[in-house]
């Protein structure tokens, strides 16, 4: 999974961003569960998921701050 560019994330609607954030949080939960039960083989998925989550949360925070400033 390639990391999305910030410009690609900014093109998403607020609803899409929220939906993706929820999906990634669920995925991280599942990954932690798989790791605890020793079923996880691709540990690099943690980093990819956390990075994408951080990008989405950053764009979401930027939008909320710009809306509050307006």
From Swiss-Prot:
Origin: domain of life: Bacteria
Gene Ontology CC: one annotated term: cytosolic large ribosomal subunit
SUPFAM superfamilies xrefs: Ribosomal protein L29 (L29p)
Cross-referenced InterPro entries: Ribosomal_protein_uL29, Ribosomal_uL29, Ribosomal_uL29_sf
Keywords: Ribonucleoprotein, Ribosomal protein
Single GO MF annotation: structural constituent of ribosome
One Pfam family matching this protein: Ribosomal_L29
Keyword Amino-acid biosynthesis: no
One GO biological process term: translation
Record has Mitochondrion as a keyword: no
Gene3D superfamilies: 1.10.287.310
Alphabetical list of HAMAP family matching this protein: Ribosomal_uL29
Similarity section: Belongs to the universal ribosomal protein uL29 family.
Protein name per Swiss-Prot or TrEMBL: Large ribosomal subunit protein uL29
Species the sequence originates in: Prochlorococcus marinus (strain MIT 9303)
